[in-house]
């Protein structure tokens, strides 16, 4: 177990470059299983979930190497059963459903893991792939799928604009015969970037970034060289950390389009934000934020992944804030940890009512998932005194070198093992 020791209350300052987008990388790595030729990816984030996806590709028979970029060379695909590959540990592995059904016509995949944030159903994935001709069943905790006659293009209406379901259907549609239409598709960064990757591989896609996406399938998909764009969630994390510590940070290398919902809410709270060239955001030193109301929604709404972090910021805002979580039904696990730091938060169902306090106080806290852990790091950075964040391995699933980046921004942090933490804390 990894532990982050934080001596808080220091305004962050400096510049940080956003890592490659975690969620885009996971989708593209799954889609790379469609390719008959070499795929070379740059700006791939050095994080745990990416390494798990690399391991899955190797188990399928691909040669995967990481140098200045990530190279994926196809071999003879020798496996379609992913039950012993670590695939069950991350949600992103679910995207191998569409990839292997398209490429091999069969797949066995453990039910996906990932963050513990309530119910995350896969019914929309299964519904979409079934409409494309796949036979899918849940057996012994595994998803067993077959498409002996191959996948066929279909019209798929999503009851909810699920990012994962949109991605899975796009990946499957790339090798399906005919055209696949996804209505009420997700419009998030990783969906757009997956589409750009598939298009770079020669797949014809229309409507990318809109609610209706059309994919014209191909018989074979070649290789490509592709650069993954900056991670808007990581960029947002550092922007929120700057606001929470009353500091000033510039984040570059990110498409501000996907940050606008966050930037609007920061400005509403009284935080001064400057956008430069559409790829750089500066958060300027600002006074104590004002209470605001946030409701998470699929993009272009406010991103659920930044909800826990905004709660850490608003815990010291002036007045009352209300945050309603509509995407996941269990994304309030960080509240009990913020209580330990002195936050005044009441939870009613999926709504948190936050009465701002003057300051948080450092305390030992436990991260139980990726974004909750990042929220506790932000809280620790802004708090007075020392905080000890246990469970940092969850955070490092999505943030590369977070402790080193924070140090470069003047934060006083140290990443240690839990055994070392006993002596330091």
UniProtKB/Swiss-Prot annotation:
Keyword Acetylation: no
Active site: 115
Catalyses which reaction(s): phosphoenolpyruvate + UDP-N-acetyl-alpha-D-glucosamine = UDP-N-acetyl-3-O-(1-carboxyvinyl)-alpha-D-glucosamine + phosphate
Pathway: Cell wall biogenesis; peptidoglycan biosynthesis
GO cellular component: cytoplasm
Coiled-coil ranges per UniProt: none
An annotated Gene Ontology molecular function: UDP-N-acetylglucosamine 1-carboxyvinyltransferase activity
Chain positions recorded as phosphoenolpyruvate binding sites: 22-23
Binding site for UDP-N-acetyl-alpha-D-glucosamine: 91, 120-124, 305, 327
Subcellular location(s) per record: Cytoplasm
Alphabetical list of HAMAP family matching this protein: MurA
Function: Cell wall formation. Adds enolpyruvyl to UDP-N-acetylglucosamine.
Name of the molecule in the record: UDP-N-acetylglucosamine 1-carboxyvinyltransferase
Encoding gene (name): murA
């Amino acid at each position: 177990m990894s532990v982050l020791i934080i001596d808080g209350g220091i305004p962050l300052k400096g510049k940080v470059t956003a890592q490659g987008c975690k969620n885009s990388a996971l989708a593209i790595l799954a889609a790379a299983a469609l390719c008959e030729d070499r795929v070379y990816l740059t700006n791939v984030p050095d994080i745990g979930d990416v390494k798990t996806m690399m391991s899955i590709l190797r188990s399928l028979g691909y040669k995967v190497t990481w140098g200045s970029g990530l190279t994926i060379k196809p071999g003879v695909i020798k496996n379609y059963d992913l039950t012993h590959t670590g695939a069950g540990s991350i949600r992103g592995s679910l995207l191998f459903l569409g990839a292997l059904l398209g490429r091999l016509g069969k797949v066995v995949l453990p039910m996906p893991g990932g963050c513990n944030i309530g119910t995350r159903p896969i019914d929309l994935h299964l519904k979409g792939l079934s409409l494309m001709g796949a036979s899918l069943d849940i057996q012994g905790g595994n998803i067993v799928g077959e498409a002996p006659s191959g996948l066929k293009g279909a019209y798929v209406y999503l009851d909810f604009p699920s990012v994962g379901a949109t991605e899975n259907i796009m990946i499957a549609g790339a090798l399906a015969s005919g055209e696949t239409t996804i209505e009420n598709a997700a419009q998030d960064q990783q969906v757009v970037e997956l589409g750009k990757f598939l298009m770079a591989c020669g797949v014809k896609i229309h409507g990318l970034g809109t609610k209706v996406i059309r994919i014209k399938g191909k018989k074979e998909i070649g290789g490509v060289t592709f650069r993954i764009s900056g991670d808007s969630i990581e960029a947002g994390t550092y922007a929120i950390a700057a606001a929470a510590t009353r500091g000033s940070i510039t984040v570059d290398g990110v498409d501000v389009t996907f940050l606008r919902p966050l930037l609007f809410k920061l400005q509403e709270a009284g935080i001064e934000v400057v956008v430069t060239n559409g790829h750089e955001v500066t958060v300027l030193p600002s006074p104590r934020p004002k209470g605001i109301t946030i409701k998470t929604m699929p993009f272009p709404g406010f991103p659920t992944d930044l909800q826990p972090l905004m709660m850490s910021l608003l815990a010291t805002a002036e007045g009352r804030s209300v945050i309603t979580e509509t995407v996941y039904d269990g994304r309030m696990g960080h509240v009990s940890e913020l209580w330990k730091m002195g936050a005044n938060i009441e939870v009613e169902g999926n709504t948190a009512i936050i009465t701002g306090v003057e300051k948080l106080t450092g305390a030992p806290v436990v991260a139980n998932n990726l974004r909750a852990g990042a929220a506790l790091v932000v809280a620790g950075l802004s708090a007075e005194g020392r905080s000890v964040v246990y469970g940092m391995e969850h955070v490092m699933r999505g943030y590369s070198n977070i402790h080193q980046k924070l140090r470069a921004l003047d934060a006083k942090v140290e990443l240690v093992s839990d055994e070392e933490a006993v002596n330091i804390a």
